Amino acid sequence: MCSPDPEDMHILTNDIPSFDKSLDPYGPEGHLALDIERFSSFMNKPDSRIMSKPVIVRGIPWRILAICRHQQNNRQVATSRSRNNYNFGFFLQCNNDDLLQKRGMWRCYGQATLEVLNANGPPIQKKIHHSFHNTEVDWGFSNYDQYDTLTSPKDGYVIDDVIRLRCRFTADVPTGANYMWDSKKHTGCIGLRNQGATCYMNSILQSFYFTTGFRRAVYNMEVGTEPNESNIVLAMQRVFYELQMSSEAVETNSLTRAFGWDKLDAFNQHDVQEFCRVLLDNLETKMKGTSEEKSIPNLFRGNMKSYIKCLDVDYESSRTESFYDVQLNVLGMDSLERAFDAYTTPETLDDDNKYDAGDHGLQRAEKGVKFVELPPVLHVQLMRFQYCGVEQKINERFSFPEKMNLSNCCELGPMLNEEDCVYSLHAVLVHSGEFHGGHYVTYINVNLHESAVDPTATAKWCKFDDDVVSRTTTDDAIVSNFGGEKAMNSSAYMLVYVRDNAIDQVLAPIPDTQIPQSVSRTFEMERMHRNREKKKQEEEQMCMSITLVTPDILATNHSFDLIEPVTITDVLPHETVYKHMVTAELYQFVQEKLFEKSTLPKVDMFDSDDETRMKRKEILRRLKTKKFGFRLWRMTDSYTVDKPQKMASRLRPSDFIEYSIDTRLDHTLSHDTETIYVEHSQFLQPLNEYLPTRDILFFLKYYDAITDKFTIIGHVTLDSHKRLNLYRMTFCDLLGLPKDTELKYYIEHAPNHVEQIDDPNRSTISRLVDDQDGAIVIVEKADPTAKKDAKTKMIELYNDVEFEFSQQFYSKMPNEEPFELFTKRFCLEQKLTDVTEFIGSELNVDPRNVMLWTRVSGSRFEPNFDDYAVTGIQCKYLTLRTLHDPRQHKKYSVSYAIFPFPVNEVHTTRMFVRLYRQMPNGNVEELNLFPPKDGTVTDLIAEAKRYYPSVEGGSGKFRLLQIGTSPLNNQRVFQIYNENTAIVDLDQRPVYKQQAQHTLNCRIEEIPHDELDVAQGEFFCPVVHYDREPTKLFGVSFVIKIRNGELMTDVRDRLRRKLPDVSDAEFAKYKFALLSRDKLCRNIEFNAGEKVNLMDMANQTTGVPQVYIGLDHKSPSQHSNEAAIRILN
């Protein structure tokens, strides 16, 4: 099988007829026919092609493509059997129209049978399946069959030089970026959106929705007084109402929120059968005491009788119990009928298993079940998931009929007659995948009610695959889901049958007019609210927010730059403007906001009618010649370039917004939030002319040495080609100083870089500020007696930083509480020793014992001792090693710890290690210690006791255990370390490159009284928890003392005492085993009289036990796919 070569372009065909409109163009299947006349002539013309009439399936044209191709590479030589040197190619072609080719990337999976009809017998049939896409639109056979075979008169394939080709095919819904499948239009139904892994829920909800008796009951339920967010009834009504009234796929977020699920729950796939039971039970509980109390039982509940009937005497014992679904075995069964027969076939009680019939004594009897009442809607759960040592899915072939009679499985009588046993298949819920994951879809016969009422109506099966709904064939819905194909691993998992005599009641359509008014009113109001919100969001996307900054606002700033960022974000008002307005309209908008109202008419920018367009056109005509007494500038947060030192950013007016009736605002302002500086006239003088090629916008900032304060005087336009000193008299005039006052000049490039202009006559203004608008020139009187100048003051402001100090603990003493937070301002150039001395004086501790750090890794503070040695280090080290920006960083958080010894000992005589400690409640927590570098386990334990003393009634003795840290040995205990073992010889791994810091694979715990002494013949055996497989460890491992020759039942009792938080009922479910190296050695049965054999648990020469005891029970934090479904509201 292959696709034809693209160079085969010669086509032998007449005009292709138009599409056959009598067929459903969006249906799942099609039939193609092509009769090739003068076939011998066709096969003697190389590279000729002919195509059939197209048939539209899934909205795509399909054709038969026949090709005569020359045999390539002489692989086939003409012989007496093959008198023709050309191959006959037979292909199915998908979507090869030029118009459809322009759709871009697309993909469509199809299956087909390619046939050559035979006048004398069966046709030649060859099957294909292929995923067609935009670069591979043909699939089939380059050499369908031998030319001699096709043309042989006795074979009957070519009659009168005519060959007849046929193709039967089915296709899935096409996918692709430009294929928008309209489920409502093509099927009359809509789907449900998948939140992540909620396909199981979507499948059963669709089945419930088309069970209109259930939908009607949900509509009629009382909503109650629960909050909307947790109201399951309201959420179910919303889903059903949207499925009935909407034209787009429905969201289920409100339903899962009402269940009490979070976003993560939506990514946990569950069992559809379990979800069905839990949801029905929840809704039935909510219906109690209301008019709908019996709705669910009347739809889904049946009764079965369990009986034991004696064969030789007249005696029978029976009881009747209700059911909401029937669970049938799949393993070993090949059909639904056989599974029902096996379910109700009685078991004979004979020989040693006779039934005790009371006064009749032991009797031969039959034990079985019979259905005594069948529900209108029968849910059949197929048990395809089983645990047989391992978790597995049973994908064996299991057929089920479209029509079913259960009379052989029933006890007919007044409550159940023959007609009550006849069912029609309504829905098939299908699972594809394996045990722990996969995908659910459902097939529903949406025409079952109509076909039951009208004998001429046919089944209309639809496939519901989350948000995509498509028509499908009956075979695809039923036969294709019998299972048995390993490659597909897709099979029916749940069947929904409806009793024939109840179809009119259970599946009766619900016209829109029959939906309760309270339901319609509620959700129509929600729909209107959503539409308003949607319109609001669309309008917001067409708008931007601007903040207007004026010279009087700048005058309030006495610090860095022109304005504090917080003033823009939190203080000044934010105005909304239309992105598509032109800059002239922005000028008009600012004029009305800040200066004076306009006589121009108002228009709504969101209206697009003719009247609005005409009004706007008139406004633009009048604005074309209008003059404004201000200029607008875009303020940007940018960095200076080509400067020798790294500098903070600066917020300056940098881009002039030119007045125009042609330039749109979104072509000038690119962000959704922008800051605009309004440059208007000051000092009772008209606004100077601005030429972008000549002038630079400057801001004048004055430093008064007497008041020690900066003041922004205003803006001024300077000629970039002139020297700065030429404007001295202008500056004096603006500052109100005598015109002969000598001035000193500085350029404020950034908060951390102020440059003094030593010779204002040497360089042009453009060179001083890199030809950038928005530059700040600081001026001050040239007073040699002043104590400080503007640059010194700016450095002083920059280095003055507030720090907030909070205490952290490495090894927290019991009941020890941290000191309260406190703040202090420091100069960034001060030494860290000043900080530690301040903390020491505040807390009355030795400053040498104070450890500082700011680095945070996740939720854990990670100090680096080499970097944070305080001697000779400045406070700027506490700014997280980033460039300090005083406009953004108003306060830095610094953590400190108080050690019981000088910090510098960590580098000299001590080492930092992290290990684990077993708490009295059984939990494990991290422990940080500073033992001597040349110490032993005894020193390590002594250091631990400083922070964690013995519990009341404890032995006061501690031990150190080697544990595992990888996922495979999760905290598993390997051995108990000897107290004389050197710390450097312990199992450890570096945390950082610095050798002073390590994590030990160890755990410290207090020794129980009964394990203090170890006699001859006694030893400690590790114990682990695992879930079915020895590699799936969980929980906290521990050790237990075992004596050679003692009863195994005593060991079990000692294990029981080690687990005080486990109930007796739960402990009874535990299984026990001997494990070695993550593998099972043997199970432990604890038989009466069985004793411990030391040889079974021999130690290796290393002292590490070869085997350990495993407790097999379910993990509390089981796999998400195995977690039980919970509906919390």
Curated annotation (Swiss-Prot):
EC supergroup of this enzyme = hydrolase
Cellular component annotations (GO), alphabetically ordered: cytosol; nucleus
- Domain USP: start-end pairs: 190-500
Q: Output the InterPro entries linked to this UniProt entry.
A: MATH/TRAF_dom, Papain-like_cys_pep_sf, Peptidase_C19, Peptidase_C19_UCH, TRAF-like, USP7_ICP0-binding_dom, USP_C, USP_CS
EC id: 3.4.19.12
Catalytic residues per the record?
Answer: 199 (nucleophile), 439 (proton acceptor)
Q: Which CDD domains match?
A: peptidase_C19C (cd02659)
Single GO BP term: regulation of protein stability
Q: Which GO terms describe its molecular function?
A: cysteine-type deubiquitinase activity
- Work out whether the entry's keyword set contains Nucleus: yes
Protein's name in the database: Ubiquitin carboxyl-terminal hydrolase 7
- What is the scientific name of the source organism? Caenorhabditis briggsae
